Structure formats: C-alpha cells, structure tokens
Amino acid sequence: RDAQESRGLGDVYKRQDSDSVAAMSSKTVTRKRAYLTFDDGPSDQTGEILDILKEHNVKATFFVIGRNERYYPMYKRIVEEGHTLAIHSYSHEYSTIYASYDNFVNDVEELRKLLYDVTGVDCRYYRFPGGSSNRVTQVPVNDLIDYLDSAGLTYFDWNALNNDAVIAGQTPDQLVKNILKDALNYDDTIILMHDLDCCHETVESLPSLIEQLEEHGYEILPIDDDTPHIQHRTH
C-alpha cells in the first residue's frame, strides 16, 4: 500500500499514456485487406469489369484461362491497367487436367507460356480449377502443390465467394450479401467471383461491393508477394 500511495500523478499519467499508445498501436497494426479475384475469363464482360475497377480506382486479380484466342488482347489490358494477371487453366477441362500429373503440368505450362508471349509477364500466381480442395483430381493434391512450388508458382484459394457460378438467378444485392457474410469475418479476405458471360449480375454488383468493403475499412488490393496465402489444402 505504501508503494501505491507514494506513486505521484506523473506515474499515473505515464501509465495512461503507455496504455493509450498500446491501444493506438494495436489499432494501427490491424490492416484490413480485400482481394477481388475473377476466375475463368477473359469474356465479353471483362472490359466492363475493368471499366468499373478503373472508375473506383481499384486493382484486382484475374485468374484466366487460355482457350479463346479472340480474348488474348484482354490479357494485355489487364496488365496495362495495373491488375494482377494469374494462371487458372489453359483448357479448364477438369477431366483432362486432373487425369494425370503430366496433364496438369502441361496445362499450367501451356497457359504460362501463352501469357508470357502475349504480355511479357511471367505469371507467378495460380488457382486450382475447383480450388485446391477439389474432389476431382486423380493425382494427390500435394504432388501438384510440389510441382507448383518447384515452378515458382504460389497458389491461392479463397475465404469468401458470391456463388455466382453455382446458383443462377441471384440479384446483384444477393451476390454482395453472399460475399460480406464471410468476408467481414476476416481481416484478410480473398473473394472469388467469375468473369463469365453468364454471370453479368457479378458485374452489376461490383460498384456496391467495392463501396461496402471500403465502408467497412478494407483496402482493396491485387494479389502480390505480400498477400497472405489463403489456401484450403496445405502440406
């Protein structure tokens, strides 16, 4: 008690200041980041997606496929406008690419070479068709992950999605709600959407999604080397 009573006001202020600094510090280190990702493009609506992103000064990540030559110029626009171009699949034919290890490797390498030839970018990020937790692959997923590691590729899954390619007929508002019910649980959220002609509601939902994420304090970023590795399957 004597020691407590002998403490001066200076000690109290020091403790309060220290507590305040600690509280402020703890607030400043909590950085909320959202990553908008689009699978399966380019498509006829990729240009509209890029226009909306530009209007909102937001960068995203496009996990693209390679089967449609008329969309190849869109790869260049994605890169030129500062977005991350990433590998999804050349063919996107699950029954083929997951039938054997060699098929998987050939599919990845074919698209990686194509993207380099068209854009000059050596893409270093990958998303498994169906995600790394897919139940289609005939090859152990860890073997495929070992290949990606050896090829200098980092794979990303997601922890929020709008279900645009799963449930038809959803409104743009419903798509946003689907995302936020999961995304708001995380400081770092990777959001799965699709760049497909059948998913135009996703395009319509984008302005509202961007605004609501920003209202909740998220910084919207493209995937890069600093992005947390949100992965469904790990070694």
Enumerate the language-model features and the residues they cover:
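Short, flexible hinge/linker loops that cap or flank conserved catalytic cores
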Residues: 3, 27-30, 185
